[in-house]
C-alpha cells in the first residue's frame, strides 16, 4: 500500500502542477485577449455616439476600439466575429444578436427595474412614442383623455369646436406613420396584438397580405386601425393631408392653437419650440382594456455582449451606475434606466416611471422591430398604408 502511495503521490503532484499551470496560462492569455475591447455602434445619432463612449471605463490597461455603423443593411455574422459588444436601438438587430450573446451577470442588472432586465440585451437609455394633449382643452372639455381610449376619442370629438385638427402627426415621416399605427394596435389589443403585428410585418412583403389577419382572439386586425384612421379626416378629427405633413406643419398648427393632441416621440418633442410644448402635457397612449398586458412603445438604446470579454462587462456595469446614468440623461435628454439616477427633466423621468410600471415592459417601434435593416421594405409598406388611407 505504501509502495503504491509513493508511486501515485508524485504523479498526483505533477498533475496538479500541470492543471495549475494550464489555468495560469489560460488566465494570462485571456487577460491579454480581453485587454482590447472592440465596440460597434449601429444606427445611433452622432450625439449618442459621442456621449456613450465618454462614460466608458477609464483604464490605461484597456484598449477600446470603436466602429460607428450607419443604418441599413448589416451582416450579423460579421458583427459576431468582429466585435465584443454592440450598442444599437433595440429591435430586429439586437434581438437576433442576443440569441447567441454572452449572458449579462445579474449583478450588473440590479440597478434597473425588473421590467427592463434582459440577460442578453439590456437598455441603457429610453425614448418614448407619446401623446401630447393641450392642457387648456382638457379643462374646457372637462375630459381626461389619458383615462381610457374611449375618453381619448371623446376628447378629440369635443375638441372639434375649438381647433381645426383635434389630432395631428406628420405622416410624411415613414417611421412616425408606422409607429402611430403600431401604437393604436397596442392600445386596442395589448402586447399580444402588437407582437403578432411585428411578426406579420416580418413575414409578409405587402400590406394586403397581412392587414386582415387576426392579431388576437377578439379578431382585431391591422385593417381595423387603418379604417379608423381612414374615417378620421371625414369626421374632422385629423387634418385631411396628415399623411404627407411634416414636423414644420405640426409646429405651424400647434403654434396657431389648432391642434388638441399630437403624436411624436421624446427625441422629436425636444426639437419643438418651448412656446408649443409648454401648452401640452405628454402622456402614454390610452388603452381600451387595462386588464390585459400592455407594453410601452419606447425605443431603447441597448447593449449586447457578443463575446465573453471581461472588460466589456466592466464597461456595461459602469454605464448602468447612478452617476453615469444621470450624465447620460443630461447629455442626450433621453430617460435613464437606473432606479436612482436623476433624469434630465420631468418628461424623461415620466418615461422611466412608465417603463418600470408597465407589465409588458418596453417594446421597439415598428421601424426598429421590423425594418431596421430594410429601409426599402419600410418605404414600400408606408406608401401602401398612405394609399389605403386615401
Give the predicted meaning of each segment.
Residues 87-133:
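Hinge/lid segment of periplasmic solute-binding proteins
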Residues 123, 296-298, 326-390:
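C-terminal capping/gating helix-and-loop segments adjacent to ligand/active sites or protein-protein/ligand interfaces
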Residues 155-211:
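Extracytoplasmic/periplasmic solute-binding protein
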Residues 1-92:
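Conserved N-terminal structural module of periplasmic/extracytoplasmic solute-binding proteins
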Residues 274-332:
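Extracytoplasmic/periplasmic substrate-recognition and gating elements
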